[in-house]
């Protein structure tokens, strides 16, 4: 763990994970948290730790919606390269209305840490977290399923969170590249893709 501090208080951190890969360029990944302004010194320090451990690169994921242009430029100057898209955020303005609620009720399930609740249907589920006036859905499923079934699940999650939490103005969720079924479900409910996305960054150095 590499931590950035300001006046004794932690303002950011990089948790380094050793995947044990034989290729030193693929061995280490980082989980970055905290202030965007601390990114460059944090990553420089993390890269040094990885280098001393025998790694030849560091990979991590950044949410571009939370990064000002100055931070993007600073990462480029550091030598970090933006790579593949991990997921893109989709958004629905609640004031636009939702289709009629499904007649089926999802089964109550234990929610992930930080989530307000979880709804599930079959082998699919959504954890729902309230962040200010936004509801954030984290979706997962065991099988591909159908767009209609996923739309019913998302509709149920949206209706439950708007009924239980006053002031929700928008619902957001993320979609992985190529997940056409989930995209179709979201489109049917009035969701639209945004410019916010998560991408994998890669910082490499010589031997």
Language model features by range: what are they?
Residues 33, 59-70, 142, 172-183, ...:
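Conserved beta-strand-loop-alpha-helix junction that forms the acyl-donor binding cleft
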């Amino acid at each position: 763990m590499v931590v950035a501090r300001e006046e004794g208080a932690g303002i950011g951190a990089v948790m380094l994970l050793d995947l044990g890969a034989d290729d030193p360029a693929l061995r280490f990944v980082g989980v970055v948290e905290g202030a965007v302004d601390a990114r460059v010194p944090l990553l420089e320090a993390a890269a040094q730790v990885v280098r001393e451990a025998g790694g030849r690169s560091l990979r991590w994921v950044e949410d571009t919606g939370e990064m000002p242009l100055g931070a993007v430029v600073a990462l480029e100057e550091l030598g970090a390269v933006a790579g593949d898209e991990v997921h893109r955020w989709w958004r629905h303005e609640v004031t636009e209305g939702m289709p009629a609620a499904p007649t089926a009720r999802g089964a109550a399930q234990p929610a992930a840490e930080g989530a307000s609740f979880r709804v599930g249907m079959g082998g699919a589920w959504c954890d729902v977290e309230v962040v200010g006036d936004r509801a954030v859905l984290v979706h997962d499923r065991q099988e591909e399923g159908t767009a209609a079934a996923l739309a019913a699940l998302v509709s149920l999650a949206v209706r439950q969170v708007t009924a239980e939490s006053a002031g929700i103005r928008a619902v957001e969720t993320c979609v992985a590249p190529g997940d056409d079924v989930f995209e179709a479900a979201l489109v049917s409910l009035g969701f639209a893709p945004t410019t916010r996305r998560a991408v994998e960054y890669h910082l490499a150095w010589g031997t």
